[in-house]
A protein has these predicted regions:
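Conserved phosphate/anionic-ligand binding catalytic regions in large, soluble enzymes, centered on
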Residues: 8-10, 86-91, 264, 374-401, ...
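Preference for long, well-ordered alpha-helical segments
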Residues: 112, 122-126, 135-139, 488-491, ...
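Amphipathic alpha-helical interface segments
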Residues: 185-187, 442-512, 516, 528
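Long, contiguous binding/interaction regions
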Residues: 1-365, 369, 376, 454, ...
């Protein structure tokens, strides 16, 4: 399952006192469920940009704590710096990374702004996607007049904060105000060119960037720049929306680059920009030799690119995520100048590495290790995890047949049909792999309840309530396994009927594995449901499980009949 991950980039109005900065970032570093990625202080601006990621609730909690600490340490009455600012924490944008939309981030930002005002007494404005008023989408409108204008703005009906508005007082004088917003993930990428010409690089940049280039009279290079009736330069737009770009020469590398900031990946994905820069460069006799990603990228950015470059080859995209990332790296030459390590550049991988420190996941074991762990005297992993893994193998077999079929000689016109089925199978496989560990985690939740105190009536009641909740979850997880494993029949059936006949036996084994996964998980639903006090809920769960089991047995028989007819 895709986790909901957001990024938070608060800008604190202190860039010179490293001890103060550390005290603020220590609060974030100590917050559970978030990963501090970067701390970038600026002396001239007297401002520090901090970046951290995590699940939404954890990120918002850490943001409130960090802003509270900043208001204790920073006195805006003493602040001077080159950058516009209006508070100890000047801005605090939330950015969707995975499993969450910009609209959902905007709702989170509004709730965060309200919390900050209530819990830290700092007035807050909502900007960009979180803005309540259209004009406040522009941060400059919220920050107009900066800190010095707050005495006038605090009670002005048109300029007062969205939350925490009150007469200007000593508290506001010390903390200032904070703008909380939501925006898309920004990706900075430099395209490497086989030229040293900044002029050529700039020409390519102007061809593609949304702003484009000034229109000229006569000669397009040196002709007089055209103006409208108001005296504004008339621009010829470039080909890529939501992209800003310039050309420059990098002495360290000895080449020119097109340097691009991508402000909305949903409008212009990375692979679309890469292809367009290649096209524009070729039109000017220049080649793109690779690309350099500056900073971090969301995983989807590379996965989508990997799929794109496979589709251009008429190749199946139903491959493991890491392979899609590798294909993206190779296709765009991301290691052209220096090695591109996804573990250090992909936001989700960085967060996963942090979360998995000291955690032993079943799906990361070798086949032998998993079997030996199952055979040990520990009660977990048990039948639930094994059922989920059998289901994952069923989906994997169907996916394998789809991938083999998509590349079969003479079947070139059907590659997309099989690619779609491979994608379907990979999605089912990934969900079942998640459930391998989740089933064991659900069992461990029950074990944790046994450790709860039961000395008083209140403790006994809390323990009983926790046991019912844990038992319910331990019943719901294998039911999810049943549903996912049953979906594996779709790809297995399609491949038995339409796939490469040389692999029809593999589809048959997939059907056997899917049936076993469903039946095994059904046993786990029944044994766990027996422990539920709420018998109406228990009976409903068992009834649903038995219906899925009956359908699975029927599907297996039908698929095996097809397989036997082709062997």
């Amino acid at each position: 399952m895709q986790k909901r991950i957001i990024e938070c980039v608060p800008n604190f109005s202190e860039g010179r006192n490293m001890e103060t900065i550390k005290q603020i970032t220590d609060v974030i570093d100590a917050s559970k469920g978030v990963k501090l990625l970067d701390v970038d202080p600026g002396e001239a601006t007297n401002r520090t940009v901090v970046t951290f990621v995590g699940e939404p609730e954890a990120v918002c909690d850490a943001a409130v704590k960090a802003i509270k600490r900043a208001t204790e340490l920073i006195d805006m009455r003493q602040h001077k710096g080159a950058h516009p600012r209006m508070g100890a924490c000047d801005v605090c944008p939330l950015i969707p990374v995975s499993g969450i939309t910009l609209e959902e981030c905007a709702e989170l930002a509004r709730a965060l702004a309200k919390r900050i005002a209530e819990e830290t007494n700092v007035p807050t404005y909502c900007y960009e996607a979180a803005a309540f008023k259209p004009e406040r989408r522009n941060l400059a409108v919220c920050r107009a007049g900066e800190y010095e204008a707050l005495p006038e703005k605090m009670m002005d009906e048109t300029r007062k904060p969205d939350f925490g508005a009150r007469p200007y007082d000593e508290g506001v004088a010390k903390t200032g105000a904070t703008a909380v917003g939501a925006r898309d993930f920004l990706v900075a990428v430099n395209y490497n060119l086989n030229t040293t010409s900044t002029r050529r690089a700039n020409a390519i940049a102007f061809d593609v960037r949304e702003k484009g280039r000034p229109m000229r009279e006569g000669n397009p290079i040196v002709g007089k720049i055209m103006k409208d009736e108001n005296g504004n330069t008339i621009m010829k737009p470039g080909t890529l929306k939501a992209c800003k770009a310039i050309g420059w020469f990098i002495e360290e590398y000895g080449i020119a680059q097109v340097s691009m900031n991508m402000t909305n990946l949903s409008i212009t994905p990375l692979h679309v920009a890469f292809d367009e820069v290649c096209r524009a460069a070729e039109a000017r006799g220049v080649r793109v030799t690779g690309a350099e990603i500056v900073g971090l990228v969301p995983k989807s950015c590379l996965v989508d690119a990997g799929r794109h470059f496979l589709r251009k080859q008429n190749r199946s995209t139903g491959l493991p995520e890491r392979e899609l990332v590798r294909i993206a790296i190779e296709s765009m030459g991301l290691s052209n100048l220096k090695p591109f390590n996804p573990e250090e550049k992909v936001v989700e991988y960085i967060l996963e590495a942090e979360e998995q420190k000291g955690v032993k996941k079943l799906v990361d074991m070798t086949c032998t290790g998993f079997a030996e762990e199952t055979a040990s005297e520990s009660p977990a992993p048990g039948g639930g995890s094994i059922s989920a893994y059998m289901g994952a193998l069923a989906a994997a077999l169907g996916t394998m047949v789809a991938n083999l079929s998509s590349h079969k000689a003479g079947w070139d016109d059907r590659w997309e049909f099989f690619s779609d089925w491979a994608d379907n199978g990979m999605a089912v496989m990934n969900e079942l792999l998640y459930l391998v560990d989740e089933d064991t985690a659900a069992f461990n939740k029950i074990m944790d309840v046994f450790g709860m105190p039961k000395g008083t009536d209140e403790e006994k009641a809390a323990r009983a309530e926790a046991m019912e909740a844990a038992t319910l979850y331990a019943t719901q997880v294998p039911l999810r396994t049943m549903k996912a494993a049953y979906r594996a029949f779709d790809v297995v059936r399609a491949m038995a009927e339409e796939g490469n006949p040389n692999s029809v036996s593999d589809a048959g084994v997939g059907a056997l594995a899917a049936r076993s996964a469903v039946m095994g998980a059904c046993l786990n639903v029944k044994i766990n449901a027996a422990g539920l006090k709420d018998r109406a809920v228990a009976d409903a769960l068992v009834k649903e499980a038995e219906e899925i089991q009956a359908a699975a047995q029927k599907a297996e028989a039908e698929i095996l009949a097809v397989v036997e007819s082709k062997i």
